[in-house]
């Protein structure tokens, strides 16, 4: 029987154009402001994303989907500080803009339902929730200054 998996969803709404949200997701300097101080990205199809999501877990992902100002999907490589898994961990950032507003959704999936994953699941979910809040604050601040992230 296939392994049962779980996921999470986060959403922010910002009064800024999608291009600014995209830049915040795909430039190392911006990622370091809201995601992780050591974050790195090689923003292209097949590129790499690296970040410390918490003090324990350093993640590295392959950029599977790269559609400027629309979608960024990350497929994570196995991590030695996480329990083993038969499923791939995935984060899918989906950007939707209209009339000067942008909705950014983050859908995390593929996290094993095994009890060994309970604590890592909570750390990932909460860490991304906090990061998305920091991203919203960053983008709202940039909008009020009239500058890009």
Language model: regions and residue ranges:
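A conserved amphipathic terminal alpha-helix motif
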Residues: 3, 110-149
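Conserved catalytic core of Hanks-type protein kinase domains
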Residues: 24-25, 66
């Amino acid at each position: 029987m296939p392994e049962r998996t779980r996921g999470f969803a986060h959403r922010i709404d910002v009064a800024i154009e999608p291009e600014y949200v995209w830049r915040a997701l795909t430039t190392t300097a911006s990622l370091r402001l809201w995601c992780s101080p050591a974050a790195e990205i090689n923003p292209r199809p097949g590129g790499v994303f690296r970040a410390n999501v918490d003090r324990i877990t350093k993640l590295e992902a392959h950029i599977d989907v790269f559609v400027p100002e629309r979608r960024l999907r990350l497929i994570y490589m196995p991590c030695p500080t996480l329990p083993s898994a038969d499923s791939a961990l995935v984060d899918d950032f989906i950007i939707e803009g209209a009339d000067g507003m942008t909705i950014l959704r983050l859908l995390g999936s593929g996290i094993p339902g095994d009890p060994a994953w309970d604590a890592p699941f909570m750390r990932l979910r909460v860490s991304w929730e906090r990061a998305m809040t920091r991203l919203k604050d960053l983008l709202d601040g940039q909008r009020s200054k009239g500058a890009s992230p």
